[in-house]
Structure formats: C-alpha cells, structure tokens
Amino acid sequence: MPDCLETGEKLFVHNMNAQCVQKPEEGNGPLGTGGKIVQGKCFRIISTVSPVKLYCCYGVIMVLTVAVIALSVALSTKKTEQIIINKTYAACSKNWTGVGNKCFYFSGYPRNWTFAQAFCMAQEAQLARFDNEEELIFLKRFKGDFDCWIGLHRESSEHPWKWTNNTEYNNMNPILGVGRYAYLSSDRISSSRSYINRMWICSKLNNYNLHCQTPPV
C-alpha cells in the first residue's frame, strides 16, 4: 500500500492511483489540538463487484438473448401452421366436405346422371372427380351404402373413359360393366345407363385463397 509522503495528507488509493487529502485533527486549534496535523494515511478503495460476478451477468444476458430468439422463431412457426390449417379445413362452404384441395357434395336424394351433372354445374362444380387413391377411399367411405354417380362417361365401349371436362381417365381403378356412365359402389366403380336414378357426388376445387386470413400478431 502506498504511503503519503507529505505530512497532513490522507491518501485514498483507487485502481492503484494515490490521492492525498488533508484532514486536520479534531481539537481546539485552527488545525486541531495544539495546531497539529495528523500524519497522512493511505486507504485503498476496492470495487465491490468481482470479475466472476461480471462474467456471470454476461452469461445470463446471453442465455436470455438466445431464449428470446428461440421464442420468436417458435411463434413464427405457430403462425405459419395456423395459416395452413385454415387453408386445409376452413375452405369449403356449408354442406361441402374438404379433402386435400377439393370440396365434395353428397346428395340427399336420387336422380339420373344428366340431372346430377346439371345440379353440380349450378353449384359451379362437376360430378365428382378423384385424382388419387386417397380421394377415392374417402368417397367410398363417406357416401355410405348408396351407389353414387360420378363424373366419368364415354361415348361407347370402344372409347376411353373421360371426366366431365373431357380429360381422359388414367384407369387407376378399372370400371366394370358396358354402360356409358360410371357410378361408385361400396367397393368398386361400375357403369350403367344414364337414366337410372342414383345418389350423386359433386366436386370442385376449393377457394382457400379467398378465405385464408393471417392470424393477428
């Protein structure tokens, strides 16, 4: 510890820099008892915060920063998932059921193929079209025990099956019978003449882009 070199000075040391301050001795004289000055003394002022504590504080700040970033990413992911859910399940209007990118309507009474197609067109749809096995399985299960007209037809037994928009059927499931109009039974696709009354199924692409809303922040 540094010593004061001058009498009457009181030394305070901070960061190893010495400072001397005069401090008279208490007494009756102007400078203390008998006019004497107390010999200077040195004191060291030491910071109360240790480097270890500072490092701990830095560590806590870093951990909190990482936690905030992780939370922001999680909230952003949740927001994206909510938008996707709205697209998948909130797209179809009342009495229509959504699967994938389509909406399906199942009739409540039987009519012939021509009437069924006209009804679907009035709803801005067509007699049902399926493009994959998942959609076909859904239609078979959801229609119940009824045979239902779908959107496949052909000009004759010598011609290929087509959908109502005139695109050819890919024969992913064979169509039984010699009729010109197809219907869906419980476990197969069959054909018959158009005038027979059956239930029917309409389908159309969903319009989720018009209904999708971003959740509030």
Curated annotation (Swiss-Prot):
Give the bilayer topology: Single-pass type II membrane protein
| Glycosylated residues (UniProt) | 112
**Location, primary (coarse class):** membrane
Q: Which UniProt keywords apply?
A: Cell membrane, Disulfide bond, Glycoprotein, Lectin, Membrane, Receptor, Signal-anchor, Transmembrane, Transmembrane helix
Q: In which tissues is it expressed?
A: Detected in osteoblasts, growth plate chondrocytes and skeletal muscle overlying the bone (at protein level). Detected in spleen, B-cells, dendritic cells, thymus, and in IL2-activated natural killer cells.
What CDD domains does its record include?
Answer: CLECT_NK_receptors_like (cd03593)
Query: Which GO terms of the molecular function aspect are on file?
Result: carbohydrate binding; natural killer cell lectin-like receptor binding; transmembrane signaling receptor activity
What Pfam families does this protein's entry cite?
A: Lectin_C (PF00059)
Would you tell me the Gene Ontology cellular component terms?
cell surface; external side of plasma membrane
Subcellular location per the Swiss-Prot or TrEMBL entry: Cell membrane
Read off the PANTHER family from this record: C-TYPE LECTIN DOMAIN FAMILY 2 MEMBER D-RELATED, C-TYPE LECTIN DOMAIN-CONTAINING PROTEIN 180
Extracellular face of the membrane: 75-217
Q: Which residues cross the membrane?
A: 54-74
Q: What induces it?
A: Up-regulated in CD4(+) T-cells upon stimulation with CD3-ligands. Up-regulated in cultured calvarial osteoblasts by 1,25-dihydroxyvitamin D3. Constitutively expressed in cultured bone marrow cells during osteoclast formation.
What protein is this chain from? Answer: C-type lectin domain family 2 member I
- Domain C-type lectin: start-end pairs: 99-203
Q: Does the keyword Phosphoprotein apply?
A: no
Q: Which gene is transcribed and translated to give this protein?
A: Clec2i
**Whose protein is this, by species?**
Mus musculus (Mouse)
**Cytoplasmic side: which ranges?**
1-53
Name a biological process GO annotation: regulation of interleukin-2 production
The set of disulfide-linked cysteines is 92-103, 120-202
Physiological role: Inhibits osteoclast formation. Receptor for KLRB1F. Enhances T-cell activation. Plays a role in splenocyte activation, T-cell responses and IL-2 production.
